[in-house]
């Protein structure tokens, strides 16, 4: 099982032998009495523990049992484990074995499909499965590779899975996708961004830049190792957090089901989502249930479907007919598209909002940091004044994430306990480079104004120079290289088994020694495998479970397999799927919306209706329904020795 790199390397090495023994001592805050003598621990027949004094009490010389006291039971739950910097790094499988396809199979066997006449008050739990679009894209790529057939469009695959799992013998599941929940998450991110921006403009202390928090691996790392930066994290719930609230709080209420009468499962691209679902903010103490009862990775969903006998290539009726409004099968519009990235499009959504609200025309200028497509800065420039009005970034992968932490710490002063000896020289060198670039700026400006047309490269160069001093406003952060389509729980490329002797590595003595590969060795689209070398053609460092070619294939299916794909996945200056005011749409045919923009407008209206039904005018309820909180983890192991997470050197 593969947790994100941000999670697995935090605060402890991975050289521990896997064990279920907890390294955190269980403390009792009750101080012992000064006159207490020696005691013993006795266990009765019911496994209750008692503390018994070994000396008779005064007035009871012959009775030792009169001082027996029942001991409080010590418990360690999953939240305690998440607050620990120990076994989670070496025994992840022990932590998440309860969330797997085996639990779903057991639920299908034990959950009654009809109400028992002898106990009519006991309702069968309503099963709901919410599938992420990244999961659908990965499954489609795997099915296409295994069968040598064209990839199955995401809408078709979603409906085939729904038709299969809705059968009574399979559990009578309601199967949704999570794109509407993502739509609500994006809307809330825009609202929160404006709140922070308004505070900053009013001269108040604002938590900027705003850092996306949809990636649980990044959140876990921030809570454990970068606690001072938690105020910068967006409080908007992720798509999983919102779909869980929708299933238990809104949909269940409409069907007159209590939250504990719904069994909600999500299928996500990474294992870290299992940890997100266990957070206390997503738990109802009133009904003793979580918003998401079980999280399956893409690979686990595939195993579940295999166990149940699913054939992805069996067609069903009306499987490719678009249906943009809510239906009996899904209370939300299916597979909404949000242009930008396959990791949620958080940055693109903010960019669209900034462009739409700015009074003058703007252009977007991008810059790859060190030539990496996983670390890109985006500048929005006013084309009239030349001012850079927004600076954002897309940061994927733990190496880039660490650089982001240092950059944000430098810009904000957050979490900077000290500076190294070479920090001053480095800052001086950067400042000198900026001054040199600025002195050359007037000549470039005059050249562009005197020539006919627009020198795009010169304008971009000038904008980058002016953007050097501009601080970041928003960052889309993901722990996995390549983003969510390359999550650790996604389907892996098929590993060819070398059978011919010439396909194996030969050592100095002539013996065949196929060395184990550190990662997945696969050739995609005609590529070649380097068997036994430990590397794969096209593999980027950090992509331990996949290759660039495989991720590109899943990415392509993600965009082309949607019912109404945008013009192109990359960021553009046009607002194709931006959020617009709540207005009635007129572009309908037979009651159905006919384009992506109108679908999102319709989704805006539905989102507002849902929020009003659940929360009314209560701002506190709305906050709890749409947002979450983050908590700095104080490690008992490190802090007890006087060492903090921030002081650990790697």
From Swiss-Prot:
Instruction: Give me the residues that bind [4Fe-4S] cluster 2, please.
Output: 215, 270, 480, 484
- Return any one Pfam family short name: Fe_hyd_lg_C
Superkingdom per UniProt:
Eukaryota
Molecular function in Gene Ontology: 4 iron, 4 sulfur cluster binding; iron-sulfur cluster binding; metal ion binding
Q: Which InterPro entries match?
A: Cytosolic_Fe-S_CAF (IPR050340), Fe_hydrogenase (IPR009016), Fe_hydrogenase_lsu_C (IPR004108)
Signal peptide annotation: none
Q: What is an annotated GO biological process for this record, any one? A: iron-sulfur cluster assembly
Binding positions for [4Fe-4S] cluster 1? Answer: 22, 81, 84, 87
Keyword annotations for this protein, in alphabetical order, are: 4Fe-4S, Iron, Iron-sulfur, Metal-binding
Job description of the protein:
Component of the cytosolic Fe/S protein assembly machinery. Required for maturation of extramitochondrial Fe/S proteins. May play a role in the transfer of pre-assembled Fe/S clusters to target apoproteins.
Instruction: Give the family, as the similarity comment puts it.
Output: Belongs to the NARF family.
Name-wise, this protein is Cytosolic Fe-S cluster assembly factor NAR1
* Species name: Cryptococcus neoformans var. neoformans serotype D (strain B-3501A) (Filobasidiella neoformans)
**Gene name of this polypeptide:** NAR1
């Amino acid at each position: 099982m593969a947790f994100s790199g941000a999670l697995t390397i935090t605060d402890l090495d991975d050289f521990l032998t896997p064990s279920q023994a907890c390294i955190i001592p269980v403390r009792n805050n009750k101080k012992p009495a000064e006159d207490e003598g020696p005691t013993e621990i006795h266990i009765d027949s019911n496994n209750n523990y008692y503390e018994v004094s070994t000396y008779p009490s005064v007035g009871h010389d012959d009775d030792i049992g009169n001082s027996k006291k029942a001991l409080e039971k010590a418990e360690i739950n999953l939240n305690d484990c998440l607050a620990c910097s120990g076994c989670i790094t070496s025994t992840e499988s022990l932590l998440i074995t309860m969330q797997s396809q085996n639990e779903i199979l057991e639920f299908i066997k034990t959950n009654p499909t009809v109400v028992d006449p002898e106990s009519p008050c006991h309702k069968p739990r309503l099963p709901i499965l919410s599938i992420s679009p990244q999961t659908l894209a990965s499954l489609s790529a795997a099915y296409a590779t295994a069968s040598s057939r064209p990839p199955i469009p995401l809408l078709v695959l979603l409906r085939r899975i729904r038709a299969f799992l809705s059968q009574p013998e399979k559990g009578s599941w309601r199967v949704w996708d999570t794109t509407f929940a993502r739509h609500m998450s994006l809307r809330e991110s825009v609202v929160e961004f404006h709140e922070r921006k308004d505070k900053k403009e009013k001269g108040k202390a604002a938590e900027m830049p705003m850092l996306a928090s949809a990636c649980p691996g990044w959140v876990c790392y921030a809570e454990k190792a970068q606690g001072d930066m938690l105020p910068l994290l967006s409080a908007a719930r992720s798509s999983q957090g919102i779909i869980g609230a929708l299933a238990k709080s809104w949909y269940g209420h409409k069907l007159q089901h209590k939250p504990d009468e719904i069994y909600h499962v999500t299928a996500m691209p990474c294992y870290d989502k299992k940890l997100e679902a266990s957070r206390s903010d997503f738990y109802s103490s009133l009904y003793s249930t979580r918003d998401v009862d079980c999280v399956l990775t893409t690979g686990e969903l595939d195993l579940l479907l295999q166990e149940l006998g699913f054939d992805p290539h069996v067609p069903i009726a009306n499987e490719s007919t678009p249906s943009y409004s809510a239906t009996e099968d899904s209370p939300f519009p299916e597979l909404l598209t949000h242009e930008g990235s396959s990791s949620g499009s958080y940055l693109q959504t903010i960019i669209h909002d900034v462009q739409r609200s700015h009074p003058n025309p703007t252009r977007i200028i991008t810059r790859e940091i060190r030539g990496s497509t996983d670390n890109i800065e985006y500048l929005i420039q006013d084309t009239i004044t030349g001012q850079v009005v927004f600076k954002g970034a897309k940061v994927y992968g733990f190496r880039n994430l660490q650089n982001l932490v240092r950059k944000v710490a430098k810009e904000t002063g957050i979490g900077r306990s000290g500076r190294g000896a070479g920090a001053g020289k480095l800052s001086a060198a950067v400042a000198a480079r900026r001054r040199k670039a600025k002195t050359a700026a007037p000549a470039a400006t005059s050249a562009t104004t005197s020539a006919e047309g627009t020198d795009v490269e010169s304008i971009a160069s000038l904008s980058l120079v002016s953007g050097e001093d501009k601080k970041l406003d928003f960052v889309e952060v993901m722990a996995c290289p390549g983003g969510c389509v390359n999550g650790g729980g996604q389907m892996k490329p098929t590993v060819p088994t070398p059978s011919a002797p010439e396909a194996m590595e030969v050592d100095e003595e002539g013996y065949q020694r196929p060395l184990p590969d550190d990662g997945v060795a696969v050739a995609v689209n005609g590529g070649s495998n380097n068997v036994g070398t430990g590397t794969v053609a096209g593999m980027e460092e950090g992509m331990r479970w996949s290759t660039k070619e495989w991720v590109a294939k899943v990415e392509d299916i993600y965009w082309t397999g949607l019912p109404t794909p945008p013009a192109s996945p990359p960021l553009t200056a046009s607002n194709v799927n931006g959020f617009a005011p709540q207005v009635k749409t007129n572009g309908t045919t037979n009651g159905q919306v006919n384009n992506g923009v109108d679908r999102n407008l319709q989704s805006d209206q539905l989102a507002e209706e849902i929020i009003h039904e659940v929360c009314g005018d209560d701002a506190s309820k709305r906050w709890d329904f749409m947002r979450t909180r983050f908590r700095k983890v104080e490690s008992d192991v490190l802090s007890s020795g006087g060492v903090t997470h921030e002081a650990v050197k790697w």
